[in-house]
From Swiss-Prot:
Name used for this protein in its record: Ubiquitin carboxyl-terminal hydrolase 10
Gene: Usp10
PANTHER family: UBIQUITIN CARBOXYL-TERMINAL HYDROLASE, UBIQUITIN CARBOXYL-TERMINAL HYDROLASE 10
Reactions catalysed, as given in the entry: Thiol-dependent hydrolysis of ester, thioester, amide, peptide and isopeptide bonds formed by the C-terminal Gly of ubiquitin (a 76-residue protein attached to proteins as an intracellular targeting signal)
Observed phenotype of the null mutant: Mice with a deficiency in USP10 show more potent resistance to RNA virus infection.
Organism in which the protein naturally occurs: Mus musculus
GO cellular component: cytoplasm; cytosolic ribosome; early endosome; intermediate filament cytoskeleton; nucleoplasm; nucleus; protein-containing complex
Stored PROSITE patterns: USP_1, USP_2, USP_3
Classification of source organism: Eukaryota, Metazoa, Chordata, Craniata, Vertebrata
Record-annotated active site: 418 (nucleophile), 743 (proton acceptor)
Length: 792
């Protein structure tokens, strides 16, 4: 008995073709109204007299088990069809008007194309078709009539037939552009035997591949099929009116056991490559695709296919799939096209039952990445096992001010990060800052997946990007008396981990529409590092006592025997005796020393003078000293410093009795930091709310001396000249005349070259000192970085 492989039908059917395939007495499919029950098939010998077509009937009470008495023919197979409107099947194809007689007489076809899911295909058993297949098997598997139309098919459409050999199925004629193939009865027996030795694996439906892929949302990578079309597709043999009602995919409940391609999330790019259905079980083999004979299935997405579950618990649905057992073997899959290629028959009974069960969807890479981000997010200091180690290191650290010769590297700017890059270059050129961050170990993501100190981690990583500069070449003589020094900068890089801090710590600098300001960003960095170090200190001493931080012994500032209880005092307030036995009430914030305050932290004293009342003084910590340069009298940095400490009157001050009194205020420097950062306030806010830039030239020296008149009375005579003298090592410039835009660059002193470098994002070049202190009109100094000369 000859076995024939299934014939597949794709594409739109003309009215004539529709009548030839589905309406003629020898070839028709009659589908009664859907009853939601399991299906069965009547054999040819059971057909009533005078009835020349097969009728698909739906059982009502029970599933009809396979019977040995039923003849094995006509045989049926389960296959999957793609949307007939898919471009790869209709491109360049013309609908065949005439169908071979063998097909018209003996074949029954059904095609479901709602989605790329399982299809219903009937195998032919006619002698005429067998003769056609036998004649064409040696000629590449194409019939004579269809071979003439081969040029009209899409490129590469028949490429899968080239690999046919002795073990492959014999090709057959084409029906509406698709081929059928024939195997041997021996192969079917081998497939049936192979089925029995397969281990049980989690079953699945013929509706979807083992790795469910969403064919609706987009094309599958590495698949030859583009996105399928499902909007206007109609199942062959069904009326238009019942199409949407019968085949619309409903939303499955959570406990539904049915898996369809339309409801599964995308979890990969592979689909099942080789599988077969035999005796109600799905088989997979590495080298061949086999199909069971004699089964035609209907799908019911809501049908309960678990035999252990009561029927009353089965959820309602629309399309039914009768199934009772499936054994797919896990095999890497490629695409849905593999379901149609080189199909081989296998011996089986007419009925095939496929059991489907839901399996938890494999998490997508994006979902797992988000979970990793959550796990690698910020954690409290108490939950960070590495935090205590860093805290112990910071407690014993000694600040090193020795200059280090680093190989310069530019910073790539792919956004509006020039204000950040300029600030980072100045901090890298600061020796104590560099040594501090190099003192802290650099932990990898594996060693420290969770962190409580993102700011410290980022700057430790930044400083480790820079290494000692190689021995510089000897200066060479150029034209005239100029000495030209060559510089060999390292490769530029993009510090994305630094940029990410703006969003990780949720700084206001990350808000859209804000003007990027280098001074504001510097404050963001220094305050952030200071706060993280404070939190680490609390690990070592949770009950840390509040200590007043002052420049010098406490006994020099406070006379205990002259303290008076004013009734308004607090732990942070005391009376201080100044020159000429004048007393003042001094208040200060809770200062806790950290390595950052040890580098950049200075103190200013603000004294308020009021008639017939004691002076009131306040100590404040600063990282950058704000210098007002708006006055026309201010032309140099020294002028701005003198203006800072000048005594000013406060207008409109009244007492509790609402009497206006004369009040004045004066600011002095209480403590000078090792690294003094001067901020030239070039951006002035107007009363109307606008902002303008002061483009006036301000002269600044390389060596800056802080005069005694700028210091507080208690420390004027306690600082030597070398402790009040600073040397310039970095300048941050702002380019342009606009306050709402512009560009930032940095000049830094390179100790290895004993000269200056100009760094503009990733561009590094050598300049002379004159270009630093006398910039052109289009670039104005904005931040001046000085170091104390006694620490050089």
């Amino acid at each position: 008995m000859a076995l024939h492989n299934p014939q597949y039908i794709f594409g739109d059917f003309s009215p004539d073709e529709f009548n030839q395939f589905f309406v003629t007495p020898r070839s028709s499919v009659e589908l009664p109204p859907y009853s939601g029950t399991l299906c069965s098939i009547q054999a040819e010998d059971e057909l009533p007299d005078g009835q020349e077509h097969q009728r698909i009937e739906f059982g009502v009470d029970e599933v009809i088990e396979p019977s040995e008495g039923l003849p094995p023919t006509p045989s049926y197979s389960i296959s999957s069809t793609l949307n007939p409107q898919a471009p790869e099947f209709i491109l360049g194809c013309t609908t065949s008007k005439k169908i071979p007689e063998a097909v018209e007489k003996d074949e029954t076809y059904s095609s479901i194309d709602q989605y790329p899911a399982s299809a219903l295909a009937l195998e032919s058993n006619s002698n005429a078709e067998a003769e056609t297949l036998e004649n064409d098997s040696g000629a590449g598997g194409l019939g004579q009539r269809e071979r003439k139309k081969k040029k009209k098919r899409p490129p590469g459409y028949y490429s899968y037939l080239k690999d046919g050999g002795e073990d492959s199925a014999s090709p057959a004629t084409l029906v509406n552009g698709h081929a059928t193939s024939v195997g041997t009865s021996g192969e079917a027996v081998e497939d049936a035997e192979f089925m029995d030795v397969l281990p049980p694996v989690m079953p699945r439906t013929c509706d979807s591949p083992q790795n469910p892929v969403d064919f609706i949302s987009g094309p599958v990578p590495d698949s030859p099929f583009p996105r399928t079309l499902g909007g206007d597709a109609r199942t062959a043999g069904l009326c238009e009116g019942c199409h949407e009602a019968d085949f619309e995919q409903p939303c499955l409940p959570a406990d539904s056991l049915l898996r369809t391609a339309g409801t599964q999330p995308y979890v990969g790019t592979d689909t099942t490559e080789n599988f077969a259905v035999a005796n109600g079980k799905i088989l997979e083999s590495p080298g061949e695709d086999t199909a069971a004979n004699g089964a035609e299935l209907h799908t019911d997405e809501g049908a309960d296919l678990d035999p252990a579950k009561p029927e009353s618990q089965s959820p309602p649905a629309e399309s039914a799939l009768s199934a009772s057992g499936a054994i797919p073997i896990s095999q890497p899959a490629k695409s849905w096209a593999s379901l149609f290629h080189d199909s081989k028959p296998s011996a089986s009974s007419p009925m095939a039952y496929v059991e489907t069960k839901c399996s938890p969807p494999v998490p997508s890479p994006l979902a797992s990445e988000k979970q990793m981000e959550v796990k690698e997010g910020l954690v409290p200091v108490s939950e960070d096992p590495v935090a205590i180690k860093i805290a112990e290191l910071l407690e014993t650290v000694t600040l090193i001010h020795k200059p280090v010769s680093l190989q310069p590297r530019g910073l790539i700017n792919k956004g509006n990060w020039c204000y950040i890059n300029a600030t980072l270059q100045a901090l890298v050129a600061c020796p104590p800052m560099y040594h501090l961050m190099k003192f802290i170990p650099l932990y990898s993501k594996v060693q420290r997946p969770c962190t409580s100190t993102p700011m410290i981690d980022s700057f430790v990583r930044l400083m480790n990007e820079f290494t000692n500069m190689p021995v510089p070449p000897k200066p060479r003589q150029a034209l005239g008396d100029k000495i030209v020094r060559d510089i060999r900068p390292g490769a530029a890089f993009e510090p994305t981990y630094i940029y990410r801090l703006l969003t990780v710590i949720k700084s206001s600098l990350s808000e859209k529409g804000r003007q990027e300001d280098a001074e504001e960003y510097l404050g963001f960095i220094l305050n952030g590092l200071h706060e993280e170090m404070l939190s680490l200190k609390k690990l070592l001493s949770p009950t840390h006592e509040k200590h007043s931080v002052s420049n010098g012994p406490r006994s020099d500032l406070i006379e205990d025997e002259e303290l008076e209880d004013t009734g308004k005092g607090s732990e942070d307030e005391w009376e201080q005796v100044g020159p000429k036995n004048k007393t003042s009430i001094t208040r200060q914030a809770d200062f806790v020393q950290t390595p950052i305050t040890g580098i950049f932290g200075g103190h200013i004293r603000s004294v308020v003078y009021q008639q017939s009342s004691k002076e009131s003084a306040t100590l404040q910590l600063f990282f950058t000293l704000q210098l007002d340069i708006q006055s026309d009298k201010i032309r140099t940095v020294q002028d701005a410093l003198e203006s800072l400490v000048a005594r000013e009157s406060v207008q409109g001050y009244t007492t509790k009795t609402k009497q206006e009194v004369e009040v004045s205020r004066r600011v002095t420097l209480e403590k000078l930091p090792p690294v003094l950062v001067l901020h030239l306030k070039r951006f002035v806010y107007e009363k109307t709310g606008g902002c303008q830039k002061l483009v006036k030239n301000i002269d600044y020296p390389v060596d800056l001396e802080i005069s005694r008149e700028l210091l507080s009375p208690g420390i004027k005579n306690k600082n030597f000249k070398c402790q009040r003298t600073y040397r310039l090592f970095a300048v941050v410039y702002h380019h342009g005349n606009s306050a709402t835009g512009g560009h930032y660059t940095t000049d830094v002193f390179q100790i290895g070259l004993n000269g200056w470098l100009r760094i503009d994002d990733q561009t590094v070049k050598v300049i002379n000192q004159y270009q630093v202190v006398k910039p052109p009109a289009d670039r104005t100094a904005y931040l001046l970085y000085y170091r104390r000369v006694d620490l050089l």
